[in-house]
Amino acid sequence: MKVPAYWKPREPKNALTCDPPVPYDLQSSYQWQSILEHDTCYAAEVFDKMMIELVYHPERTSSVIMRTDIILDSQEDDSILNKQKSVFENLDERYQISRWIDRRIIPRNTNLDATMDQTVVVLHEKLENDRILMYLPHLDKSLEQPYNHLPYYHPAVAGIAFHYKGSSVEVLYLVEKDFQRELSSRLLRTAHMLLLVLHKHCKGAVEGYQKRMLHDTVVERNKFQDTYVILKDKYAKQLVDNWVEKTDPGKHVFEDLAIAAFLIELWKQTYSSNKEFSFVDVGCGNGLLVYLLLMEGYNGYGFDARKRKSWETYPLWVQVKLYEKVLVPYFLHDFETKIPFPQLPAGFTMSAANIHDGRFSENSFLIGNHADELTPYLPILARLNQKCYFMSIPCCVHDLTGAKISWALPKPRNPKHGGRYAMYIEWLMQLSEEVGWNIEVEPLRIPSTRNYALIGRKLLSNDLLHSSLSTDALYDIVEKNHGSQGFFVHAMQVAAANSRSH
């Protein structure tokens, strides 16, 4: 984590303190030790808000944590607070419990790290404006030094506390009373990082920081993550170990596992059964996504202009679902009456075996995962085919001619989003809306900066369900969006070249 120039934490003058109360069952053996403190620039209400946000998002403090599941929250049941007062002796003298949360921390790799249950207690001082938030892991007290048996992502201490004092905030560890040795460098680094993360969040809140993108608006995060972990455990090792492409398996395997997990959860929302539809991966590349979806019981196929080495590593029943075909949308041929086309290669027709004309079976779901020059055609083809939906993850900036875009792209409708990729996403959304789609946008949790998914499963109006897109209307839309001249001939030339090479 980058450390800002203003960040200058210090050791408190009095490291041993009894300010935060110690849970009754730990009082005889443990005490709080203050580790670091830093000046504040925010009010107590900001501390309260940001600390609870971090309680709900522990992954912001450790890359090995995936998420937390909330087991119990007093905000949903006030009676919990009265029941838990007995945990602290003489609490009523100075503090009152304002919130009690039990949570379960879920690591990214459950083969390396265990889950951990933890209680979070928020205390408000009655006479002052002080706040204390304590993290208390559920210790196995039958063990000697039970904190040494906690997962690696938690420091080897019996508890962590943050004490807001108005002008400063400090981080404390719950340690044994006979604790005499110096803290390890790891414990010090962890305290430093925890305090810095808190300070950055609070400072950002004061300065009006708002997230540029909102995740998990289409598919719930927990459902996606649970499915991703299942897929990763089933497939990741064998796929990485047997990778035959020149590309990095550390990126591509886990990216496609995440996309497969997202699609599976999206389809659970969209369809009542996986027998209700079939998928088509347009420009399927190495075929990994097709393999994963077929293995998970979904029906479909993929095609690409060029066969990949990976295809032969899949089971035969998967290989027969991967086709070497070039997409030449049939409606471009219909435009012949409006724009001149050069001669096709001798003896070559639109019905050639290695041509896919963009006609799909009813109830198809089209996938465009970094499909490059095919990307702009997905919303059009999905609209032209019966009961057809799509999800596109755009990458390189191509228009309907198949060329890299050289014309001025529109500004994103969200002013927080900038850059050429954001403008390309905006153009694709506008094109999709022009042919009738009500587009859902989801920044996917994948290891790629080109991670926006455009999802078309709803039309702008119910009236469009009963009307088709005419050739004339489509031609006008295509021409308005800088035309398609060049795509048809280039695609046919690729198809002709492929047929000659076999």
Curated annotation (Swiss-Prot):
Keywords of this entry: Cytoplasm, Methyltransferase, S-adenosyl-L-methionine, Transferase, tRNA processing
Localisation per UniProt entry: Cytoplasm
An example Gene Ontology biological process: tRNA methylation
Pfam families, alphabetized: AdoMet_MTase
EC numbers: 2.1.1.211
Enzyme class label: transferase
Catalytic activity: uridine(44) in tRNA(Ser) + S-adenosyl-L-methionine = 2'-O-methyluridine(44) in tRNA(Ser) + S-adenosyl-L-homocysteine + H(+)
Primary subcellular site in the record, as a coarse category: cytoplasm
GO cellular component: cytosol; nucleus
GO molecular function: tRNA (uridine) methyltransferase activity; tRNA(Ser) (uridine(44)-2'-O-)-methyltransferase activity
Keyword flag Ribonucleoprotein: no
Record InterPro entries: SAM-dependent_MTases_sf, tRNA_uracil_MeTrfase
Function comment: Probable adenosyl-L-methionine (AdoMet)-dependent tRNA (uracil-O(2)-)-methyltransferase.
Protein family (similarity comment): Belongs to the TRM44 family.
Name by which UniProt lists this protein: tRNA (uracil-O(2)-)-methyltransferase
Record organism: Schizosaccharomyces pombe (strain 972 / ATCC 24843) (Fission yeast)
Taxonomic path: Eukaryota, Fungi, Dikarya, Ascomycota, Taphrinomycotina
